[in-house]
């Protein structure tokens, strides 16, 4: 008889508390109601001290997430504000990137990384964690970031909860990664003397892929009269992202670093906030050019 994997091996409850789900990329993750957190299969087996192969021989009861919905999550207890003294390593890392430790970032005490949270309206719906120290995965490749299980990146934007934009916003800048969006946001906040005077809203796709939901959301902003400016990396993946956004008719302009080795955060480290804002604005081109 197969072991019922719905009994959590971490908190050891008397009843079934685990629910299994599958992301768009086919990866399986689980959520324990009593632990009040999600796990990837690898995380769970490591914490529960069980061999992954042995665990996979057990019985699974899959519950598919609905295709166009995100789920509100409980805030993990290991996520703490950067103002907390225990977050010193996170603050040091953010500063090493030329960034100010301002904005909606946190520190994950367990993973030793900077947390980028995702929201829809006022609901926390997931996060990514950028490790302070780069790790090496089982295939020998660099591993820089992990995603909180259950986070549906294709339905979310970094630094935008998909609510109505503030009245002062006139243009939306769409970057690949959170640090790039944050670099540009801080640059424009500096230029305009604060966020309340800044007409630019910088957001992130969390990668170079543009989902149908993200494209539709950006096209809606464009149709409302906002300038929507793609700001991908100047590499193969970034240029493919730009081409797809043009094809989806969800942008009005684009801006590139024109350096295959440097993204917007790299430029910030080189030239500072004021000069980055100037450089970006001078680099803006219409998609019709």
Predicted regions and their residues:
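TOPRIM fold recognition
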Residues: 9, 30-33, 169-170, 178-289
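Short glycine-/small-residue-rich flexible loop motifs, especially phosphate/cofactor-binding loops
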Residues: 42, 91, 181
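A generic alpha-helix surface/boundary motif
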Residues: 39, 88-89, 178
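TOPRIM metal-binding catalytic domain and adjacent DNA-binding surface shared by DnaG-type primases
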Residues: 1-15, 46-125, 162-167, 282-289
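Phosphate-handling DNA/RNA-contact segment within nucleic-acid enzymes
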Residues: 111-224
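Short Cys/His-based metal-binding microdomains
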Residues: 19-55
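Broad, structure-driven detector of short, well-ordered beta-strand segments within folded domains
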Residues: 16-24, 107, 128-130
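Structural detector of coil-to-beta-strand junctions
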Residues: 15-18, 29, 113-115, 172
């Amino acid at each position: 008889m197969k072991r019922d994997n719905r009994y959590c091996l971490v908190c050891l409850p008397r009843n079934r508390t685990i629910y299994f789900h599958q992301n768009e990329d086919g990866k399986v993750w689980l959520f324990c109601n009593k632990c009040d957190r999600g796990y990837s299969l690898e995380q769970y087996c490591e914490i529960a001290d069980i061999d992954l192969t042995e665990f996979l021989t057990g019985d699974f009861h899959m519950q598919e997430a609905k295709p166009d919905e995100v789920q509100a999550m409980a805030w993990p207890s290991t996520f703490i504000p950067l103002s907390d003294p225990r977050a010193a390593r996170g603050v040091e890392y953010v500063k090493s990137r030329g960034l100010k430790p301002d904005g909606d970032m946190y520190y994950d005490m367990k993973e030793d990384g900077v947390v980028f949270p995702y929201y829809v309206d006022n609901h926390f719906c997931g996060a990514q964690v950028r490790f302070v120290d780069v790790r090496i995965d089982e295939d020998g490749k660099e591993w820089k970031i992990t995603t909180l299980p259950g986070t549906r990146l294709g339905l979310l934007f970094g630094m935008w909860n998909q609510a109505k934009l503030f009245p002062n916003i006139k243009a939306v800048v769409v970057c690949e990664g959170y640090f790039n969006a944050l670099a540009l946001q801080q640059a424009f906040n500096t230029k305009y003397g604060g966020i309340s005077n800044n007409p630019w809203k910088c957001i992130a796709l969390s990668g170079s892929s543009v989902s149908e939901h993200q494209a539709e959301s950006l096209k809606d902003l464009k149709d409302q009269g906002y300038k929507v400016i793609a700001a991908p990396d100047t590499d193969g993946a970034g240029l493919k992202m730009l081409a797809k956004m043009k094809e989806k008719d969800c942008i009005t302009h684009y801006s590139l670093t024109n350096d295959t080795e440097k993204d917007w955060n790299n430029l910030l480290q080189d030239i500072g906030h004021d000069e980055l804002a100037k450089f970006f604005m001078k680099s803006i081109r219409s998609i019709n050019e």
